[in-house]
Curated annotation (Swiss-Prot):
The active site is at residue 545. Residues 1-28 form a transit peptide. This is Mitochondrial intermediate peptidase. It comes from Schizosaccharomyces pombe (strain 972 / ATCC 24843). It holds the Pfam family Peptidase_M3. The gene is oct1.
Length: 762
């Protein structure tokens, strides 16, 4: 059944489905193309009458398969056949590489990247399908194919023949660093990945490495699952002790009997209790109960930490942090610690003022004649009240009021992002046709990203609304990254079933693979036919993820292994965090915050007031993150191998020194620190990139955040390189501080001492 719609383009009214609308738009666009496509962009996200896509057959055209891959038009066998094809192509390239009598580093690196592209083009697609597809059978098929290729990838990571070929070629081409620096960088990355996998170890050590790595991965998954699924713990409290607490919260609690109430202490519910309960003694009990750990939980974490340290020792590193940071901007654990110490020192004076103000609030509320201690369990309660007092000063400017959400329809925000990127980089979003079978759900929208010469620079699939079975949170997926194409790589794409007739662009007489991105969010779709309206946190999420997308689209490199977001962990968040600074800037506000169906912008006073309220606790939040990053460094140092290591004692020492709460009691809060699994020794990265983003935003965009000149400088210094250039050189160029170009201890110290310059809402 075709969905009929009424769409107004200027003075013309068009009835039809999405495909008809797009076709008529193209005719109409000869007159007012840019204005028409800008309005249509907003409408395809906001007007539910428009058929976002048609999964059924249209005009006799058969389904093209997910992401226009013809293998995937067959849901039953397509995934495995695609995996098998990629495997066969990889093995053929490997055989050819090992037999080829060449030690030319550039040629060898190019073939390594070809292998990597064959694998990543398919396995990244499978990973996305596992996270997003609503059909459980399709997910199962994708998982089966993913496992098939993952096994091959693990085999290649420990392939001694490939390792020796690469190592020898880099040694035999000493001038490669100067003649082809990008090839040299890619080659070094491949070599480091091999050595991190223990391929260069002698046989018995290599076997131990494989075994210990497997054990560590198992322990890590167990710890992560425990940290994310901790059983709720309750306190039974008499109703009298809850006098003065939030009545809505108290009414929501289970009652043991008419005189006692059960209060949850773990996770989100525990945090709500700390926000809502007025009695400081009860808050302390909630905090302590919610941060208890069993002997088994502590031992699981300790075993996990020891296993990682033992893996590092097998490859000649004194700690897991030393192993992890080899290829990061920080380079060494001591540099991370010095950065965090300097940042903590920079934050200390304003932190003391905030804690003193909160202690004064506590004194007043408890009617004391002395300044009481301000404890860790007081933080949530008084921070919430302090923010509410700021909101109450100007209640008409509170953006949580429902009316203000109508300035943030999904279509308006995405239209605003397109307008922002047009100002900064000369890029714009244009709604694209969707062929039958190309997308996985009717909610999905597709846009092409065009430059000012009307060349397609990238493709973005937006999957923004929550649904059952979809992965939680927000995520940016690179389905295919950019890379320079030659005849062999073009043939590879065709062999893998990709429709590359529409996925190639030409620049300087070179052909490049067009990056394909998918953005996942979990916004709650509006009921009925109204547009979906976002709150400011949702808007922040879109801006953040679009920062990653722009990095993927503008990160043009010769080799896919270092394209876009394939860069150092402590550099990759910089482009996304800087987008949060754009969002918080009053000059950018009219681009993305306009009242439903109009061009009337949100009053700038609302944003300024919101920024002021949120930033009122920013130093507290920063100090908490510094403390967690310090614990992350502690847990990945060699101290965990000491037989006398006691995690709770060590964490208590770090907490008292770096949390802002010098008398914090021993507590096992770190058992809920799930990032110890995914961000081992690199949790500092988000803080580090926030500081870098603030410095770069202040340098380039403070005077005019819509400056094309500044946008071009950011693109040329930061975005275009992906991971093919030293990130320190990128930062040094953007900040015009050559002294930073070599990185190292002094550079980390300088960045930490600078602190956060620009302000972000979040």
């Amino acid at each position: 059944m075709q969905v009929r719609t009424l769409l107004t383009l200027g003075k013309k009214k068009v009835i039809g489905n999405r495909q008809c609308i797009l076709s008529l738009y193209r005719k109409y666009s000869n007159v007012q193309s840019r204005k028409a496509e800008d309005q249509l962009l907003r409408q395809i996200f906001d007007d539910q009458n428009i058929a976002v896509n048609q999964i059924t057959k249209r005009n006799g055209i058969q389904g093209v398969g997910l992401f226009r891959n013809h293998f995937l038009s067959d849901k039953d066998t397509g995934f495995l056949r695609l995996a098998e094809t990629a495997s066969e192509k990889c093995k053929a390239v490997i055989e050819d590489l090992l037999l080829e009598d060449t030690e030319d580093g550039s040629i060898v690196v190019s073939k390594f990247d070809r292998i990597s592209n064959l694998l990543c083009s398919v396995i990244d697609l499978f990973e996305f399908v596992r996270c997003a597809h609503p059909d459980k059978m399709v997910v199962m098929k994708a998982e089966e194919a993913y496992s098939y290729l993952f096994e091959l990838m693990n085999t290649l990571n420990t392939h001694q023949g490939l390792y020796e070929k690469l190592k020898c070629s880099l040694q035999q081409t000493p001038t490669l660093k100067d003649t082809d620096p990008e090839a040299y960088t890619v080659g070094r990355v491949f070599l480091q990945d091999f050595e991190k996998s223990g391929v260069n170890l002698e046989s018995s050590k290599r076997n131990s490495f494989v075994k210990k790595s497997s054990e560590s991965a198992t322990l890590g998954r167990a710890f992560f699952n425990n940290s994310m699924n901790r059983p709720q713990r309750y306190l039974t409290i008499s109703k009298q002790r809850l006098a003065g607490s939030d009545p809505y919260f108290v009414r929501s609690l289970s009652k043991n009997d008419k005189n006692f109430i059960m209060i949850p202490t773990v996770g989100y519910e525990g945090t709500q209790a700390l926000i809502s309960v007025a009695n400081p003694d009860v808050r302390k009990e909630i905090y302590m109960e919610g941060h208890k750990g069993t002997v088994e939980e502590v031992e699981l974490l300790n075993s996990y930490l020891r296993s990682k340290a033992e893996v590092a020792k097998l490859v000649g590193k004194s700690s897991f942090a030393d192993l992890q940071l080899i290829d990061k901007m920080a380079n060494a654990p001591k540099h991370v610690v010095e950065f965090l110490e300097n940042l903590s020192l920079k934050n200390s004076s304003v932190l003391k003022k905030i804690l003193n103000n909160l202690a004064l609030m506590k004194k007043k509320e408890l009617n004391l004649n002395f300044l009481p201690s301000f404890d860790v369990w007081d933080r949530e309660y008084y921070t919430a009240r302090y923010k509410q007092s700021l909101i109450n000063q100007k209640p008409s400017l509170n953006p949580s009021i429902t009316n203000y959400r109508r300035f943030f329809s999904v279509g308006t925000v995405i239209q605003g992002l397109s307008r922002l990127f047009s100002s900064l980089y000369g890029l714009r979003f244009v709604p694209a046709d969707i062929s039958p079978g190309e997308v996985w759900h009717p909610d999905v929208n597709k846009v092409n990203v065009y430059n000012e010469n009307d060349h397609v620079m990238g493709v973005i699939y937006f999957d923004l609304f929550a649904r059952t079975g979809k992965t939680d949170g927000a995520a940016h997926f690179t389905i295919r990254s950019s890379r320079e194409l030659d005849l062999t790589s073009f043939d590879d794409s065709i062999s893998l079933g990709f429709d590359d007739a529409t996925n190639i662009r030409v620049k300087d007489n070179k052909r490049y693979q067009i990056p394909v991105i998918s953005l996942l969010c979990n916004f709650v779709r509006s009921s009925g036919m109204d547009p979906t309206f976002l709150d400011l946190w949702d808007v922040k999420t879109l801006f953040h993820e679009m920062g990653h997308a722009m990095h993927s689209i503008l990160g043009h490199t010769k080799y896919q292994n270092l394209a876009g977001t394939r860069c150092a962990t402590d550099f990759v968040e910089l482009p996304s965090i800087i987008m949060e600074f754009f969002m918080s800037n009053p000059a950018v506000l009219p681009l993305y915050a306009r009242y439903e169906g109009t061009e009337i912008p949100l009053p700038v006073q609302v944003l300024n007031h919101h920024n002021m309220v949120e930033n009122s606790s920013a130093p507290l939040d920063l100090q908490s993150q510094i403390c967690m990053a310090m614990v992350d460094q502690l847990f990945h140092s060699k101290v965990v191998l000491d037989p006398s290591f006691n995690s709770i004692d060590e964490v208590t020492n770090v907490t008292r020194k770096f949390s802002g709460f010098e008398s914090a009691p021993p507590a096992a809060w770190y058992l809920q620190f799930s990032h110890l699994y995914g961000y081992s020794a690199t949790y500092y990265s988000y803080i580090f990139d926030t500081v870098l983003a603030s410095l770069i935003f202040s340098k380039l965009f403070a005077g005019n955040p819509l400056s094309r000149e500044a946008g071009e400088k950011f693109r040329k210094a930061i975005l275009r390189w992906g991971g093919s250039r030293s990130p320190w050189e990128c930062v040094a160029e953007a900040l015009e501080q050559p002294i930073l170009a070599t990185g190292g201890e002094e550079a980390m110290r300088r960045i930490g001492s600078e602190g956060i310059k620009a302000t972000s809402t979040f």
